[in-house]
From Swiss-Prot:
Upper lineage: Eukaryota, Rhodophyta, Bangiophyceae, Cyanidiales, Cyanidiaceae
Protein name listed in UniProt: Small ribosomal subunit protein uS5c
Any one GO cellular component localisation term in the record: chloroplast
Record function comment: With S4 and S12 plays an important role in translational accuracy.
Subcellular location(s) per record: Plastid, Chloroplast
Amino acid sequence: MQNMNEQQEQWQERVIQIRRVAKVVKGGKKLSFRVLVVVGNLNGCVGVGMGKAADVMSAVTKAVVDAKKQLINITLTPTNSIVHASQGRFSAAVVFLKPAASGSGVIAGGAVRSVMELAGIQNVLSKQLGGSNPLNNAKAALLALKSSSANAR
């Protein structure tokens, strides 16, 4: 039981977006909630997940489970930055990441900032181009981190 609690505490989660969606059925509209969540351990492991349910709490739980299924490992430098510049593209969203000097902080906005902070990255520059959808930007940031780590090996 102690080990289970330690594993639970090691992951941090952050809700990026809660959206009420509707399915039109014969009797009217069936409302549900779609939640976008980022999960990370602040030590080079991060994932993005989405969940949909009739109430917000169930949707958040489903999103966390989905995010933990899609975790990626990132190679961090001693200054808690990425190894080298990279680019990720998902749908219309394009995210550029560039390593920054120690003390620069996370210079990113929206969903990309959440992904960087929960991955444990403390010094990075980013630029978002194309779409402004938080889901697409978060997934583009993950792809950029993945390509940065893949090229480092």
